[in-house]
């Protein structure tokens, strides 16, 4: 059952591995955006590891303590939200490489993350396991959908914020990638047993 529920995560790991190898083999200028992309790749890799960890705990609830199961889910949900936030910052960095975000604005942009963290710490989380599919649901999970919508909109807005920085092709790629991930998120919301978030991140790149 564990392997069956990890099929999309395995596909995501393979895609991320190919992207990582391609990135390493091709020379890049030592730009802020290049370093940030490495951070983004690392965050996605960690997210996928946590994703597979939660699949294991929820499919082995008879041998894994409830506190460990909840804690791992909390880390996983937080990692999803942080990848969303970092993706938005990366898009903004590409669109306006010369400017730096002021600390006050960073705090404003992190308000959704802060609210999500409060819910992750104190919120309710439920588990479903029918022997074939397994997933978590509840108010804690809803924070992912809310942050996904917010940072998708902000990412698209950032891509079109300044004329002449990103080409039309680059803007189209940003819009396509972010909308693709959001569509996958909507599919995940309607069919929670599919566990598509990690695959969505990999395809978005």
For every predicted segment, state its role.
Residues 2-13, 116-157, 184, 188-197:
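Extracellular-loop-to-transmembrane junctions of the mid-late helices
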